[in-house]
């Protein structure tokens, strides 16, 4: 009778490699889920004085900061009051107080999205070392007075949850636009028409495209 052999060391090695690969895949996914783009892409910053600055950029949805790269180091734009608009690929961002809103619809009634997510600790008390203070950096110097450097790696014991918010701007005032009731409060005189339009077109306002469709229609109401 043949003696059975058990390759326990090989099995253990296989299980360890599988766990490592799975963890690496999850980590890679987490490292990009809190940025708008999967990697830095070329963008431009239009200053209020008309000057244009160009850099490789992305947007951090946890800290709600515009990130750019200088000499291989990732930094955050500051002095937002001097910035008019940021353009990344075909997308448009405007500074609002201390964060950036992305423009989705431009008109008398404009629609913006606040790209945002929350960082959640899954139970490990160790802190998130996502940023460290540095001195002033001379790149986009007109934009950046005090900056932070960023680590793009998210610790394994943390994960992100979506916290995106939508806003409409009318007469230079921002209003929440995350539900039909919030939108109708901005147009109380057109609430019946808005409600009927949502029903007729079967709009789901959790869907960004449907929300855009509704705000485009709202612009017709205020002509």
Please give the residue ranges for each predicted region.
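Bacterial Sec-dependent N-terminal signal peptides
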Residues: 1-32, 214
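Short N-terminal segments immediately surrounding and downstream of signal-peptide cleavage
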Residues: 25-46
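Glycine-centered tight beta-turn/hairpin loop motif at sheet-sheet or coil-to-beta transitions
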Residues: 48-50
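Aromatic-patch recognition
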Residues: 53, 57-175
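A short, solvent-exposed beta-edge/loop patch
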Residues: 150-213
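Short, low-complexity, Pro/Ser/Thr/Gly-rich segments in the mature regions of secreted, periplasmic
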Residues: 211-223
């Amino acid at each position: 009778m043949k003696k059975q052999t058990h390759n326990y060391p090989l099995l253990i090695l296989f299980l360890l490699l599988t766990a490592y690969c799975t963890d690496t895949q999850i980590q890679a996914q987490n490292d990009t889920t809190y940025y708008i783009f999967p990697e830095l892409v070329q963008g431009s910053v239009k200053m209020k004085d008309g000057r244009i600055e160009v850099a490789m950029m992305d947007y951090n949805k946890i800290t709600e900061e515009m990130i750019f790269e200088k000499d291989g180091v990732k930094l955050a734009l500051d002095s937002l009051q001097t910035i008019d608009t940021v353009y990344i690929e075909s997308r448009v961002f405007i500074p609002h107080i201390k964060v950036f809103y992305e423009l989705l619809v431009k008109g008398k009634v404009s629609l913006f999205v606040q790209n945002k997510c929350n960082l959640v600790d899954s139970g490990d008390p160790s802190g998130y070392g996502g940023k460290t203070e540095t001195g002033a950096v001379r790149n986009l110097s007109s934009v950046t007075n005090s900056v932070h450097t960023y680590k793009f790696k998210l610790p394994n014991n943390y994960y992100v949850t979506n916290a995106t918010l939508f806003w409409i701007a009318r007469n230079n005032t921002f209003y929440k636009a995350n539900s039909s009731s919030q939108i109708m409060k901005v147009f109380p005189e057109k609430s019946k028409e808005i409600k009927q339009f949502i029903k007729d077109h079967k709009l789901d306002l959790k869907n960004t495209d449907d929300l855009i469709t509704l705000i485009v229609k709202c612009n017709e109401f205020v002509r």
